[in-house]
From Swiss-Prot:
Coiled coil: none annotated. Residues 2-222 form the Glutamine amidotransferase type-2 domain. Homodimer. It catalyses: D-fructose 6-phosphate + L-glutamine = D-glucosamine 6-phosphate + L-glutamate. NCBIfam families: glmS, PRK00331.1. One of its GO terms (biological process) is UDP-N-acetylglucosamine metabolic process. The gene is glmS. This is Glutamine--fructose-6-phosphate aminotransferase [isomerizing]. GO terms for molecular function: carbohydrate derivative binding; glutamine-fructose-6-phosphate transaminase (isomerizing) activity. It comes from Thermosynechococcus vestitus (strain NIES-2133 / IAM M-273 / BP-1).
Length: 626
């Protein structure tokens, strides 16, 4: 959601803040602003709309400052107007705050502050914070005056938040605090940074320290001090990220999304190299997979429950199919936002898997935390077993759950998930292989077939990209004015139909729905006519003939049919008006391939419509509020 950056050091703060905000644009925003300190004065510059509007304002000013904070806002409280943009200031314009999150008790705090004479200039929940801190500052600056004022203020805040604070009376300090919202500190040479996410500081340093819940820190030109909310000094050591600045550049692609679609074969290849044992054979006495998960996590499982949101939920649906059909473990998949308020009965020997690409999705974290709390203290069979699947092991998820499958997809900038979705699918394939081996639920020769098929996927993915993109780009010209799409799939490819529909609606703003192909006659068929294209995933296997039959029902209603299917299937060629060919593979492995043409179709339709593919309206890459 919102993005925070902060800097203190010898360089010009304004440009570093603006460059950091540019790296956080992918999180989604509707306004932006920075605040800097120079010669005892606080300067705040804000702008509605795109970050370039702020850049143009800043360029008109001669800002000489070595400490500052910046923010991209995604509106939650108050309209997306300049007066609601961050940073927010106290009544004397001496103190500025940026915040990511939601202050749940802000109305109560605002009423109290107004009764004491404070004047508010925005509709936001954030503005209560600078007023609270200002009240708690000593009249004369003291050694720990700002730090202590922030510490006391956060005790009055309810909700999830990350904040950064600067004050004209404390020109050599930048204070940050975290509670249920991400914040990371970067360590440079005589300079220090803070940000909501690491891409903002990767150009300057790879030494980072993610703050944990209930922690605050003081950044000065000489170092970083970390404290808990009770004021106790903590010993913390930064870690080194295995990233570099090139990973967050477009590298010649028009959009990050297209670049990330093309990175998918490499993501799958890296995942296989990291987790699939090259020396495994059918007769080997060891598992084909090395996930480094303790036996206690997976032994005697009777049930698996998956919690996730959005695209990660679709990955969970594919995971459910694999875990039930191959590993033979009953599995449920729930939206994390629903799980929290209607949790299922506690069942013994249950593994709970949280799936989130960012590791910061608020609903998923809250669902996992609730599951942890309601099982703690119960007898052995009901003890919590938690596993996370994420692209960011250093995230809040990595601190919450004891075990992680790192999808190793690298930073994803485009708001619409592509390579991280495929990486999540790979995590479920690998987990399924591990459980199948342990439980002996699958014949070894069948396991060998799946392992061989997985190893062939990267080359097959590259084949699709090389052979299909130009055709799909040309095909997209037929649909740039289309108002509705239907996506159909069955079995393990039903979630891919859902994902294809989600991608299209996210970035092209075209209404699209995904359905199980067998459900067409139970309602969706009423929507069909010559103006509603139907995209159908038809892969040879257990439901191939059924899917083609369902597609014929759509043809009878004059719908234009687009088929994701192998090229050499004669019956499919006669059924569909347009083919998006994919190699014929084992039906269980097909989702990795069938999703690629759907990603490309969504991308090219959106690009043809002249839309901002990487930053679609109203969406955020990392949804850090409930």
């Amino acid at each position: 959601m919102c993005g925070i950056v902060g800097y203190i050091g010898p360089q010009g703060a304004a440009q570093i803040l603006l460059q950091g905000l540019q790296k956080l644009e992918y999180r989604g925003y509707d306004s932006a602003g920075i605040a800097t300190l120079n010669e005892g004065e606080l300067l705040c510059v804000r702008a509605k709309g795109k970050l370039q509007n702020l850049v143009e304002k800043v360029e008109q000013l001669d800002i000489v400052a070595h400490v500052g904070i910046g923010h991209t806002r995604w509106a939650t409280h108050g309209k997306p107007e300049e007066y609601n943009a961050h940073p927010h200031r106290d009544s004397r314009d001496r103190l500025a705050v940026v915040q990511n999150g939601i202050i749940e008790n802000y109305r109560e705090l605002r009423d109290q502050l107004q009764a004491r004479g404070h004047i508010f200039r925005s509709e936001t929940d954030t503005e209560v914070i600078p007023h609270l801190i200002a009240e708690l500052l000593p009249e004369t600056p003291t050694a720990n005056g700002l730090l202590e004022a922030v510490r006391q203020a956060v005790h009055q805040l309810e909700g999830a938040f990350a904040i950064a604070v600067i004050c004209a009376d404390y020109p050599d300090e930048l204070i940050v605090a975290r509670q249920q919202a991400p914040l990371v500190i970067g360590f440079g040479q005589g300079e220090f940074f803070c940000a909501s996410d690491t891409p903002a500081i990767i150009p300057y340093t790879r030494a980072v320290l993610p703050l944990e819940n209930g922690e605050l820190a003081r950044l000065t030109p000489t170092g970083v001090e970390v404290y808990d909310f009770e004021g106790h000094r903590l010993r913390k050591t930064p870690r080194t990220l295995n990233w570099n600045p090139v990973m967050v550049e477009k590298q010649g692609f028009k959009h990050y999304m297209l670049k990330e679609i093309y990175e998918q074969p490499g993501v799958v290849r890296a995942c296989l190299e990291n987790y699939l044992r090259a020396d495994w054979e059918v007769a080997s006495p060891f598992s084909p997979v090395q996930l480094n998960l303790p036996p206690s996590l997976l032994d005697n499982l009777q049930h698996i429950q998956i919690v996730a949101c959005g695209t990660s939920w679709h990955a969970g649906l594919v995971g459910k199919y694999l875990l039930e059909q191959v590993a033979q473990i009953p599995t449920s998949v729930q939206y994390a936002s629903e799980f929290r308020y209607a949790p299922p009965p506690l069942l013994p020997h249950t593994l709970t898997i949280g799936v989130t690409q960012s590791g910061e999705t608020a609903d998923t974290l809250a669902a996992l935390e609730m599951e942890l709390k309601r099982r703690q203290g119960l007898d052995g069979a009901l003890q919590p077993r938690l596993l996370g699947i994420t692209n960011r092991p250093e995230s809040s998820l990595g601190h919450l759950v004891p075990h992680i499958i790192d999808t190793r997809a690298g930073i994803e900038i485009g708001v619409a998930a592509t390579k991280t979705f495929v990486a999540q699918l790979m995590a479920f394939y690998l987990l399924t292989l591990e459980l199948s081996w342990q439980r002996q639920s699958c014949d070894r020769s069948r396991l060998a077939e799946l392992v061989t098929g997985l190893r062939q996927l990267p080359a097959q993915m590259e084949q699709i990209l090389e052979s299909q993109e130009r055709y799909i780009e040309a095909l997209s010209h037929d649909f740039w004015e289309t108002q509705d799409f239907i996506f159909l799939g069955r079995g393990i490819n039903f979630p891919i139909a859902l994902e294809g529909a989600l991608k299209l609606k996210e970035i092209s703003y075209i209404h699209a729905e995904g359905y199980p192909a067998g459900e067409m006659k139970h309602g969706p068929i009423a929507l069909l006519d010559a103006k509603v294209p139907v995209v159908t995933i038809a892969m040879p296997g257990s439901v191939f003939e059924k899917v083609l039959s369902n597609a014929q029902e759509a043809r009878a209603r004059d719908a234009r049919l687009i088929g994701v299917t192998p090229l050499d299937e004669a019956e499919a060629q006669h059924t569909f008006d347009n083919l998006l060919p994919v190699p014929e593979v084992d039906e269980l492995l097909s989702p990795i391939l069938t999703v690629i043409p759907l990603q490309l179709l969504a991308y090219h339709i959106a690009a043809r419509r002249g839309l901002d593919v990487d930053q679609p309206r109203n969406l955020a890459k990392s949804v850090t509020v409930e």
